Structures are given as structure tokens and as C-alpha cells.
From Swiss-Prot:
PANTHER family linked to this entry: GLUTAMYL-TRNA GLN AMIDOTRANSFERASE SUBUNIT B MITOCHONDRIAL AND PROKARYOTIC PET112-RELATED, GLUTAMYL-TRNA(GLN) AMIDOTRANSFERASE SUBUNIT B, MITOCHONDRIAL
Family indicated by similarity: Belongs to the GatB/GatE family. GatB subfamily.
UniProt-recorded name of the protein: Aspartyl/glutamyl-tRNA(Asn/Gln) amidotransferase subunit B
SMART domains for the chain: GatB_Yqey (SM00845)
GO BP: any one term: translation
Quaternary structure, from the entry: Heterotrimer of A, B and C subunits.
EC number: 6.3.5.-
PROSITE patterns per the UniProt record, alphabetical: GATB
GO MF entries: asparaginyl-tRNA synthase (glutamine-hydrolyzing) activity; ATP binding; glutaminyl-tRNA synthase (glutamine-hydrolyzing) activity
Role description: Allows the formation of correctly charged Asn-tRNA(Asn) or Gln-tRNA(Gln) through the transamidation of misacylated Asp-tRNA(Asn) or Glu-tRNA(Gln) in organisms which lack either or both of asparaginyl-tRNA or glutaminyl-tRNA synthetases. The reaction takes place in the presence of glutamine and ATP through an activated phospho-Asp-tRNA(Asn) or phospho-Glu-tRNA(Gln).
EC supergroup of this enzyme: ligase
InterPro entries, alphabetized: Asn/Gln-tRNA_amidoTrfase_suB/E, Asn/Gln-tRNA_Trfase_suB/E_cat, Asn/Gln_amidotransferase, Asn/Gln_tRNA_amidoTrase-B-like, GatB, GatB_C_1, GatB_Yqey_C_2, Gln-tRNA_amidoTrfase_suB_CS
């Protein structure tokens, strides 16, 4: 029996406002616990909230970028529940009348085809506080309480974990590109909950869904969905019934575990917040927001392919990060060689970033340095092999390529007479290999080139070395 997954994502995105959603407290991350609080975000009696206009603007901006329609009249509601990190015993959110609705994201499938993932709604809400656990007990930090969020709710259009990850990657790149969030999953400014059920292929009815929480990376999302898919299938195959519940991803044991039974909307007793007026949005305001949105990632990807003629795969990776795309364009302006910039970014530079667990914006050398570095190779001042050592030195020290080349004497040797003498010595010292080459073992050419490069410490121009060796062997 073949099963398929039915997956929808609820993505919570912290907005990059300087102050909280309903008060003037700072949203700065990492401050001393309970220092960015006031009577409003602590829910003290008599304190009245006032909606931050920037929150509405950022929510609209996200909605427009994600192809949503904007509700011209929306309101704030109270979601009632008791938990220690919720000081008011209710959360200010939007239920019946969200800010945005009916959007979509287009993702690329593994076979190269495009697929639309529809977005049901985007609504504004405030974040809760944060629980801190240590050996002395559990403490609550309310600095995060009242920080503005948008929740982006997809329809259950995804059929496997890879589609879900692709959707989240695309969503993150859009939100970062338009400047509404830094989307740092490790800091919790982008959090994702997944709803997943399974059904037999061909069946139109949805199965019983479970919600999964505590996934703070793309890898965790993929692993959690794969595990839950297999778990639910196993339950059904054994004659059981999947129970609607909330589960969390246990990273240490690579499995989902039960948190609580799943609540329905009725359990939260939503009703309008009487302390906040309805939000009226004019056509002019919508147009202003539209005009403020720059180039979106999919538009940038299309332009890069046409303008720079670099491979689609490279373009997709480079444009998925605003910082990487900007680094690429600035380096290309200097070097006038987009293909080389792409190759170095996708190759050695990405390897060094991953090895040192840092991002492109934290790199020590500038895009201008990369452009100058590529010009040194293109002008034959240094060789490609020297370039690999040079880029690592730039990465570690932040020094300019010209300074390192001068300090270490790395200038490429293009002197044909000097190279000829070294070639003659290599061939003279390896008579058996020369005979083998002439008898048909042509792969030995690489050995001879390697010996010359070893003697010259990689400084000899490899093109000239190849030409001279071939000429000498064929005499």
C-alpha cells in the first residue's frame, strides 16, 4: 500500500522593528533578562496597548511579496490561554480578519518542474516570553514578550519533506530580501511548526494530522517530517489510529515525542481586543508599500542567468542569500569576470565558510579584494594553484591579494627560457617515464607537469609548462 504525506507549515517570523508590537520597549536580542519590559508587555492592570504602525507596514510588505491580497479592514483579537510565559493570559493576534490572505510561493521540484504552494493567510501577533531552564529551576525572561511576529500559514499543499524545506528556504530568502526580518533560525527569529498527516495515494480525504514543533533548522524540519511520516504509516499498518496531538522534534534521539493533545480554535476562545481599534488600510498605503519592495529573489535569479550567464544551480545558491548576491555583484564589477566570481564563491570560498561555520557577511576580505584576486589570475600574474593558497590566506588574514602576493613572492613565472631549463631537468631525471610516455602512456604528462610545478613551488605558468613539455617529448 502506497502512502503520501499531506504537509502544511506555520512559520513565525520576528519583524525587524526597533520597538515591540504594542509598546515602546526595545526588541534588541540578547539583552539582560527582564530589562526590556514595561506595564504593557507585562500585562499589568490598567496598561493600554498601542499598535506599532511599522508592524502593519512590514506585514503588508511580506504579504505583497508573497502574492497575497491585503485586507483593507482587519482587527486584533485575543487568543486566551494560560501558560507561564504569557503574562496577560492571552496573546494579541488576528483570527477572523487577518492582514493578508490568498498568496503563494513557487518552488522548484527535484525534476526541475515548478510547483505553487498556496498561502492561506498572514496575520500579526505578539511573541511570548522565554523559559530558561538551569540547575536552580525554571525562570521566565519577558524581554521577548510583545515582540512583533507575522505568522505565515500555508495550505497543506506539500507532499514530502523536500518540498517543505524548499518552501521554507524560498520564504526565508524573500523575507530577508525585503528587509522585514533577519530570519536567524538559531536566534528564534524564524520558527517553523509543521502539520502532517498521511493517506493512501489516490485517496482525496485527509488523514488525522499531528503538529510538530521545535525545528530550528532546515535539516531538523526535513528529518522530523520524514520520521513522522514513517511513524504514522507504521501506526496505520498495525491497525491503529493516528491521534491528533502536538509533538516536538527530539534532536538528540532523532524522533518526535508527544507534548500534548492538539487544541482546536474553540479552545482558545478568540474574541476582538477591545483596547485596540480596527486597522483601516487605504489603496494609497498599499501602493506605497508595493513601491518600497525591491528586486525579489526569483527576479534576481532570472536576471543573473540572463545578465551574467552563469549556471542555473550556481545562480539559485547565490541569489538565495541577499548578502551573497551583493558580494557577487560587487566582485563582478571589479573583475569583469562573472563566471570566475561564481566559481570561487561556489567552490573554495563556500568550503572555507562551511569549515569555519561563518556567513559571507562575516568574511574578512571584501568583494573588491575578490575582484582584484580574479584579475591577478586573469592577467597571469598568479596561477590558479597559487590562487587556492592565496584565497585561504585572504580568508584567514583579511589582507588584500596584492599585499600577500608581494609579501610572499607569489608572482607567476611566465619566463619560457627558465621554464624550459626546469622541464629539461625533469625529463633528464626521469628517462624511464619518458620512454613509457613515448610508448603510449600519455597520462604521464600530468606527472611531468606536477614535477615542474613542485620545483617552482606552483609559480610556473601551467599553460606554458604543458606546451614546453609536449614540445620536448615530441622532438
Amino acid at each position: 500500500m502506497n502512502y503520501e504525506a499531506i504537509i502544511g507549515l506555520e512559520v513565525h517570523c520576528e519583524l525587524l522593528t526597533k520597538t515591540k508590537a504594542f509598546c515602546g520597549c526595545s526588541t534588541e536580542f540578547g539583552a539582560k533578562p527582564n530589562t526590556h519590559v514595561c506595564p504593557i508587555c507585562l500585562g499589568l492592570p490598567g496598561a493600554l496597548p498601542k499598535l506599532n504602525k511599522k508592524v502593519v507596514e512590514y506585514g503588508m510588505k511580506a504579504g505583497i511579496a508573497l502574492n497575497c491580497s491585503i485586507n483593507k479592514l482587519c482587527r486584533m483579537d485575543r487568543k486566551n490561554y494560560y501558560y507561564v510565559d504569557c503574562p496577560k493570559n492571552y496573546q494579541i493576534t488576528q483570527s477572523e480578519y487577518p492582514l493578508c490572505k490568498d498568496g503563494y510561493i513557487e518552488i522548484s521540484l527535484e525534476n526541475g518542474e515548478a510547483k505553487k504552494i498556496s498561502i492561506e493567510r498572514i496575520h500579526i501577533e505578539e511573541d511570548a516570553g522565554k523559559l530558561i531552564h538551569n540547575s536552580q529551576g525554571t525562570f521566565v525572561d519577558f524581554n521577548r514578550a510583545g515582540v512583533p511576529l507575522i505568522e505565515i500559514v500555508s495550505n497543506p499543499d506539500m507532499r514530502n519533506s523536500k518540498e517543505a524545506v524548499e518552501y521554507l528556504i524560498h520564504l526565508r530568502s524573500v523575507l530577508k530580501a525585503i528587509g522585514v526580518s533577519d530570519c536567524k533560525m538559531e536566534e528564534g527569529s524564524l520558527r517553523c511548526d509543521a502539520n502532517i498527516s498521511v493517506r493512501e495515494k489516490g485517496n482525496k480525504e485527509f488523514g488525522v494530522k499531528c503538529e510538530i514543533k521545535n525545528m530550528n533548522s532546515f535539516k531538523a524540519l526535513e528529518k522530523a517530517l520524514n520520521y513522522e511520516f514513517e511513524r504514522q504509516i507504521e501506526v496505520l499498518k498495525n491497525g491503529g489510529k493516528v491521534i491528533q496531538e502536538t509533538r516536538r522534534w527530539d534532536e538528540e534521539n532523532n524522533k518526535t515525542v508527544v507534548m500534548r493533545s492538539k487544541e482546536d480554535a474553540n479552545d482558545y476562545r478568540y474574541f476582538p481586543d477591545g483596547d485596540l481599534v480596527s486597522i483601516n488600510i487605504s489603496d494609497n498605503w498599499i501602493e506605497e508599500i508595493k513601491e518600497s519592495i525591491g528586486e525579489l529573489p526569483h527576479e534576481k535569479e532570472k536576471r543573473f542567468i540572463e545578465q551574467y550567464e552563469i549556471p542555473k544551480y550556481d545562480t539559485k545558491i547565490i541569489t538565495s542569500s541577499l548578502e551573497m548576491a551583493e558580494f557577487f555583484e560587487e566582485a563582478t564589477k571589479i573583475s569583469k569576470n562573472a563566471k570566475a566570481v561564481s566559481n570561487w564563491l561556489m567552490g573554495d570560498i563556500s568550503r572555507l565558510l562551511n569549515k569555519n561555520n561563518i556567513k559571507i557577511e562575516e568574511i574578512k576580505f571584501s568583494p573588491k579584494d575578490l575582484g582584484e584576486f580574479i584579475k591577478l589570475i586573469d592577467k597571469k600574474i598568479i596561477s590558479n594553484s597559487i590562487g587556492k593558497d592565496l584565497i585561504e590566506e585572504m580568508f584567514l588574514t583579511g589582507k588584500s591579494p596584492k599585499d600577500i602576493v608581494e609579501e610572499k613572492g607569489l608572482v607567476q613565472n611566465n619566463n619560457k627560457e627558465e621554464i624550459l631549463e626546469i622541464v629539461k631537468k625533469v625529463l633528464h631525471d626521469n628517462p624511464e617515464n619518458v620512454t613509457s610516455y613515448k610508448n603510449g602512456k600519455t597520462k604521464l604528462l600530468g606527472y611531468f607537469v606536477g614535477q615542474v610545478m613542485k620545483i617552482t613551488k606552483g609559480k610556473a605558468n601551467p599553460k606554458i609548462v604543458n606546451e614546453i613539455i609536449l614540445k620536448e617529448l615530441n622532438m
